[in-house]
Amino acid sequence: MTTTQVLLDSLLANKASINLATTEQKNQALSAMADQLVAQTEAILAGNAIDMEHAQGKISQVMQDRLLLTEERIEAMADGIRALIGLPDPVGLVLEESTRADGLNICKKSIPFGLVGMIYESRPNVTSDAAALAIKSGNAVILRGGKEAFHSAKAIVTALKSGLEEAGVSPKVIELVQDTSRVSATELMTAKGKIDLLVPRGGAGLIQAVVENATVPVIETGTGICHVYVDKDADLDKALRIVVNAKTSRPSVCNAAEVLLVHEEIASQFLPRLEEALSGQVELRADSQAQALLNQARPAGDQDFDTEFLDYIMAVKVVSSVEEAISHIAQHSTGHSEAIVTENSQTAEHFTLHVDSAAVYVNASTRFTDGGEFGLGCELGISTQKMHARGPMGLREMTTYKYIITGDGHIR
């Protein structure tokens, strides 16, 4: 039996302690987990320093920033856990209830999944976010992070387990897989009958591998080829702020904009202003119409409109209408987040109606697609599928339901 299988069996043996925990018990656990994260900052930073040293020359500067932990980022992780305490318990909610004419009562009630698995890559904060969401929603969780962030994740899980123990909750309801090879990932994907839900979070290759090979239920958190469309009726000052923010505020995350579509009637006014505002910070890869209006853009290649750059790179295209923008998005989007900038309410309504993505914005940056920004607390990921969960996966999406039928000697 492998170490991963041993962890799974241990989680199965202990999951009832969190599946059946009261709201008070779960909130006490979260509070202690957050406190221990801060208390063990030194150990977490030491683990992160090892990961950062290993990352030198192997991943981009943008991805290194994604990996980096600081005291401030650890405090933010703790704050994310504390934010969950104030949110309603998603377990035990009466979703639907009816009583038949013969007196038989049928109640649909929310319950935890049981044991949730998470496969992710190089962002250390995902470790604490996933664990905290699992605890609040009453789930045990097995975490399998990438090798790039292993020492960071190990230190974080140690702190979280200390918090659970301090609060009187079994620390054996959170486990980190020590093996970061493909073997352990495959073991989780095929742990049918043990893992109730598996969520992959990372690049397109990881997500595709899980979706194609898993025999356990999966929620796909898709890559983010996010678009911003600047309409002919846009306020160009507003558009400039939105595009710059959507691309540059944190380019390594999935809600950053990767493609800019600009209406031909305002392209000559807007694109030179955008290029100036970006000050050479972003490499623009433009179609022929856009390139003619820009000084330093390079020609867009065949794959540029289908690439999640996660870097200071943006594909740019000039379109003749909102319909062409919608058509382009339908062809190239991953269904994550899209935005329109326009002062025309009819055009905005047309865009939101016809763009089929998890989050569609009017006059706002795509960077808001986030559990915290949506008032959901931290998130497990951004689901781009349509069944069960779509958009930021918060507490409610970490539950399923069962029917409780109460009678008085009823027979059929």
Swiss-Prot record:
Keyword Ligase tagged: no
InterPro entries, from UniProt?
Ald_DH/histidinol_DH, Ald_DH_C, Ald_DH_N, Aldehyde_DH_dom, G-glutamylP_reductase_CS, Glu-5-SA_DH, GPR_dom
Where is it localised? Answer: Cytoplasm
- Write out the GO MF terms: glutamate-5-semialdehyde dehydrogenase activity; NADP binding
The cross-references to CDD domains, in alphabetical order and at most eight, read: ALDH_F18-19_ProA-GPR
Q: Name one GO cellular component term.
A: cytoplasm
Q: In which pathway does it act?
A: Amino-acid biosynthesis; L-proline biosynthesis; L-glutamate 5-semialdehyde from L-glutamate: step 2/2
Which keywords does this chain's UniProt record carry? Answer: Amino-acid biosynthesis, Cytoplasm, NADP, Oxidoreductase, Proline biosynthesis
Name the protein family: Belongs to the gamma-glutamyl phosphate reductase family.
Free-text function comment from the UniProt entry: Catalyzes the NADPH-dependent reduction of L-glutamate 5-phosphate into L-glutamate 5-semialdehyde and phosphate. The product spontaneously undergoes cyclization to form 1-pyrroline-5-carboxylate.
Identify the PANTHER family for this entry.
DELTA-1-PYRROLINE-5-CARBOXYLATE SYNTHASE, GLUTAMATE SEMIALDEHYDE DEHYDROGENASE
> Which HAMAP family did the record assign?
ProA
NCBIfam families (alphabetical): PRK00197.1 (NF001221), proA (TIGR00407)
Q: What's the protein name?
A: Gamma-glutamyl phosphate reductase
**What lineage, starting at the top, does this entry show?**
Bacteria, Bacillati, Bacillota, Bacilli, Lactobacillales
Q: Which gene carries the instructions for this protein?
A: proA
